[in-house]
Curated annotation (Swiss-Prot):
Its EC number is 7.2.1.4. GO terms for cellular component: cytoplasm; plasma membrane; vesicle membrane. Keywords: Cell membrane, Membrane, Methanogenesis, Methyltransferase, One-carbon metabolism, Transferase, Translocase, Transmembrane, Transmembrane helix. The gene is mtrE. Belongs to the MtrE family. Its main location: membrane. The keyword Hydrolase does not apply. The chain crosses the membrane at residues 3-23, 63-83, 86-106, 133-153, 157-177, 226-246, 266-286. This is Tetrahydromethanopterin S-methyltransferase subunit E. It comes from Methanocaldococcus jannaschii (strain ATCC 43067 / DSM 2661 / JAL-1 / JCM 10045 / NBRC 100440). InterPro entries: MeTrfase_E. It is a multi-pass membrane protein. The complex is composed of 8 subunits; MtrA, MtrB, MtrC, MtrD, MtrE, MtrF, MtrG and MtrH. Pfam families: MtrE.
Length: 303
């Protein structure tokens, strides 16, 4: 089969995996109140809001997911060097990363909550730990497995020269940054502040004054994940999927347009860079058009 068709197929699969990974990563961070919402949940007891959120963030998502995916990639790489099946190795690597993720989540939650118990009266809810740990580890396993499989495809089929653990680390940092900047805003600036008028942002005076009541009963991280699965998680997945697909597509297109095997690598690289700049310019124009349309349609926020 033609190598270009194989590369395009691997690229399409990588884009689909990236979409699933981005969505799962954002929903996992919503269950655990990591990144954007983290500081608001941390401040809530100091503002008199005793809550039932799971708060597991010691670091930002780029650092933590860089760790998880790098662990999975390193374990999978070591197992593959022993001669085991690559798919089995990737599954085992993601499984080890899931255990690391679970230990990290529990220690972070208990450390943060216990630190606030004495001075601010925030109790440790053990049922919150047990009910939230499964979705956190489960969503994390899905995200990590998809990304380590993407790293394997990039290394074996798409011709990436870097070793599997390093590619996995880069993918983990990337998805963490996207989830933090794209999806978590839906939770940290909207879901946690539904009692305030929409569109006003989060003024400093309101920091920590989060919603602690749900539609029925007290709110927790599971409610937030359900809410964000309709928009924040989807947007994170689409963003990561488009980045992976478009970046790989411009590389494949550069190889095609260079003139086959007779073209030079430098020519292919220049073509890929030009295509990338064109894509960035088009996306910037679309972003500006959407922003102007939204401001003209809904007007500035007043009170």
């Amino acid at each position: 089969m033609d190598a270009t068709l194989i590369a395009l197929g691997a690229l399409a699969l990588s884009g689909a995996l990236a979409t699933v990974a981005g969505c799962a990563e954002d929903l996992e961070s919503d269950v655990g109140s990591q990144s954007n919402p983290n500081s608001q949940v941390q401040l809530a007891p100091q503002m008199g809001n005793i809550h039932r959120y799971f708060n597991k963030a010691i670091s930002g998502e780029p650092v933590s997911y860089g760790l998880y995916v790098a662990v999975a990639g390193t374990v999978a790489y070591a197992i593959m060097q022993m001669g085991l099946n690559p798919i089995l190795a990737l599954i085992l690597g993601a499984g080890v990363a899931a255990f690391v993720h679970g230990a990290y989540a529990i220690s972070a939650y208990l450390g943060r909550i216990v630190g606030q118990s004495k001075n601010f009266g925030q109790p440790v809810y053990w049922d919150v730990v047990m009910s939230h740990l499964g979705p956190i580890v489960g969503h994390g396993f899905i995200a990590v497995f998809c990304m380590v499989l993407m790293a394997y495809l990039a290394n074996t089929i798409l011709g990436n020269p870097f070793p599997l653990p390093l590619i996995a680390l880069i993918f983990g940092i990337t998805v963490g940054a996207i989830g933090s900047s794209t999806g978590d805003v839906h939770y940290g600036a909207e879901r946690e502040y539904q009692k305030y008028p929409f569109g006003g942002g989060v003024p400093v005076a309101n920091h920590g004054d989060i919603d602690i009541k749900a539609e029925y009963g007290l709110r927790n991280g599971m409610d937030s994940s359900y809410f964000c699965s309709r928009l924040g998680g989807v947007l994170t997945g689409l963003c990561f999927g488009l980045i992976v697909f478009l970046d790989g597509w411009r590389g494949v297109l550069g190889d095609i347009l260079k003139g086959g095997q007779g073209g030079s690598v430098i020519t292919a690289s220049i073509i890929s860079i030009v295509i990338g700049l064109i894509i960035v310019a088009i996306l910037a124009i679309i972003n500006r058009k959407v922003e102007v349309f939204a401001r003209n349609k809904y007007g500035p926020y007043t009170k």
